[in-house]
């Protein structure tokens, strides 16, 4: 079972959609070798070195955490039902109210839209806040996403810079 990597007052909590089969098998977030999450957050500067999925607990030392909208593993996120995503959105709101990070970064526009019931979603900072927590929508780093590593880094860099500016 995949567990949240959360603590009070983190800089950012990255919210994946749900675990893929490789992640579920290995027991670590973003464990599929084709997933670029660990590379992206390192290139942007959230981590000083490239962490492996097995080192996910070290994210807490950097002020970062991980959660997910839905705990059920699937081959593709498109297998998730609308109700699962809505319930996941409600659970994320509760977690953010409890842990109060500076930012929540939901990794996927369509999943964010369905989980939070917002029809028009753009990339980046959202007008929605959860308490004092800023809400961001960033591209999913899954290998199934056609975005290049460079474009993922640019998107995540915007969040990193915003957090640095207000530090």
UniProtKB/Swiss-Prot annotation:
Enzyme Commission code(s) on record: 3.2.2.28
Entry superkingdom: Bacteria
Enzyme class: hydrolase
Membrane keyword on record: no
A Gene Ontology BP annotation from the UniProt entry: base-excision repair, AP site formation
One Pfam assignment: UDG
GO molecular function ontology, one term from the record: uracil DNA N-glycosylase activity
Catalysed reaction equations from the record: Specifically hydrolyzes mismatched double-stranded DNA and polynucleotides, releasing free uracil
Alphabetical UniProt keywords: Cytoplasm, DNA damage, DNA excision, DNA repair, DNA-binding, Hydrolase
Location(s) in or outside the cell: Cytoplasm
InterPro entries in the record: MUG/TDG, MUG_bact, Uracil-DNA_glycosylase-like, Uracil-DNA_glycosylase-like_sf
Span of the signal peptide: none
Gene Ontology terms: cellular component: cytoplasm
Subunit structure: Binds DNA as a monomer.
Alphabetized PANTHER family for the sequence: G/T AND G/U MISMATCH-SPECIFIC DNA GLYCOSYLASE, G_T MISMATCH-SPECIFIC THYMINE DNA GLYCOSYLASE
Record function comment: Excises ethenocytosine and uracil, which can arise by alkylation or deamination of cytosine, respectively, from the corresponding mispairs with guanine in ds-DNA. It is capable of hydrolyzing the carbon-nitrogen bond between the sugar-phosphate backbone of the DNA and the mispaired base. The complementary strand guanine functions in substrate recognition. Required for DNA damage lesion repair in stationary-phase cells.
Family: Belongs to the uracil-DNA glycosylase (UDG) superfamily. TDG/mug family.
Name by which UniProt lists this protein: G/U mismatch-specific DNA glycosylase
Species name: Pectobacterium carotovorum subsp. carotovorum (strain PC1)
Gene responsible for this protein: mug
